[in-house]
């Protein structure tokens, strides 16, 4: 990919974040997400790429979402696959809580695992523990191996995990080992990036979250030279084996089979992101551990964006000032 595309993709996540921010704290996560989707699509279609959404917001019949298989861009330029999460943390945006982001990852054609929208077990570490993780092993063994690689005792190891009932037993297990556990309400993409940031105290991300978010995480972890294992899980294996969950879970398993993916098999980082020639952009909507949130006074807004180019392993933090009433009219509808 041409390196100048990076700044174009930062504009895409900035616009999605500004659109989502318009609905900050209003209790309507679906409207916030829809606004971010529309803004992201408008900006993507202005970029000189022949792009295909491979991780998106829904299936082909679920417009106006950015659906899997949708073509974006002008059709001229590099052929790329795109993984999007227009708002990573829709509930946090709706409730005015921390760590909401607009996220985009772009790679060469065939770069990303075309994961179904289902659950994924994830284990992520930074460069210092690369090659030490294996989801086939018990979690305790993995944590000991990571701690050894980092040259620290378990008592100094920090693990981030989503604060969900399904993780209660795992959190207790880790705390009994002496590990420090940060339980966060949502937003495991941001938490996964923190494992690879030099100034972060987070060593490990573990837990069960969304598979699409897992592929987005894999893209940025590959770009930052970290490591990740994933395992696709059917809904009834995560949420409980009742009739409804079983019905949905069987549909997920059928989709995996049709896509040639084996659920329950451990996926390595190279299975999910097959190249480090990726561009990742994330813009903060609300203030968080990774990025500042949007600040807006009248028609002037300030954003902070994390822009990573994997091929050169360049990490940029971009602070931008936006005069919203100077944006294109079709964008003003979503951000003003």
UniProtKB/Swiss-Prot annotation:
SUPFAM superfamilies: Carbohydrate phosphatase. GO terms for cellular component: cytoplasm. Its main location: cytoplasm. It is an enzyme of class 3 (hydrolase). It catalyses: beta-D-fructose 1,6-bisphosphate + H2O = beta-D-fructose 6-phosphate + phosphate. CDD domains: FBPase_glpX. Mn(2+) 1 binds at residues 33, 57. InterPro entries: FBPase_class-2/SBPase. Optimum pH is 7.5-8. Induction: By glycerol and sn-glycerol-3-phosphate. Substrate binds at residues 88-90, 119, 164-166, 186-188, 210. GO terms for biological process: fructose 1,6-bisphosphate metabolic process; gluconeogenesis; glycerol metabolic process. The keyword Protease does not apply. Its EC number is 3.1.3.11. It is found in: Cytoplasm. Changing residue 57 to A: Strong decrease in FBPase activity. Mn(2+) 2 binds at residues 85, 88, 213. Disruption phenotype: Cells lacking this gene grow normally on gluconeogenic substrates (succinate or glycerol). PANTHER family: FRUCTOSE-1,6-BISPHOSPHATASE 1 CLASS 2-RELATED, FRUCTOSE-1,6-BISPHOSPHATASE CLASS 2. Homodimer. E.coli K12 also possesses a FBPase class 1 (Fbp), which is the primary FBPase in E.coli and probably represents the main gluconeogenic FBPase. Belongs to the FBPase class 2 family. This is Fructose-1,6-bisphosphatase 1 class 2. It comes from Escherichia coli (strain K12). The lineage of its organism: Bacteria, Pseudomonadati, Pseudomonadota, Gammaproteobacteria, Enterobacterales.
